[in-house]
Amino acid sequence: MDHIKGSQNQIDWKHFLKSGDRIFIGSNAAVPNALMDQLIDEQASALNDIEVVHILTLGENRWAQKQYQDTFTLNALFLGQGTREAVHEEYADYTPCFLSEIPSLFHDRTLPIDVALISVSPPDPHGYCSLGVSVNVVHAAARSARM
């Protein structure tokens, strides 16, 4: 893929993402923290109004920090330690729903996803990847996303 370069997998974000896009990020132990850190470090000043949709996340959740509120708008479908403060302080949104309802939100475009940032295994000899440790709604998000 020409948009991912070098051994450090530097991503040319302008080919994937633009201001105003809605991204879905993987959940629980499969949060793509390295991708999100790279996006924040390289593009936080160049992008704005990126809606980040996710269910429960583990880790630092830099995108949910107040200093990035002009770049990222968090839309948490479940609340956890890393997102509760942002919602309480009203610089993030909480959309309560049942886990079983989320795939339909993506498929019927009630909540259209532009880009899905997810963790997958390396491809096997046949080119198939596993969604790994946290599949839940990730499959629906990946299939529904523009990219």
Feature-to-residue mapping (PLM):
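Conserved alpha/beta enzyme-core scaffold
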Residues: 1-147
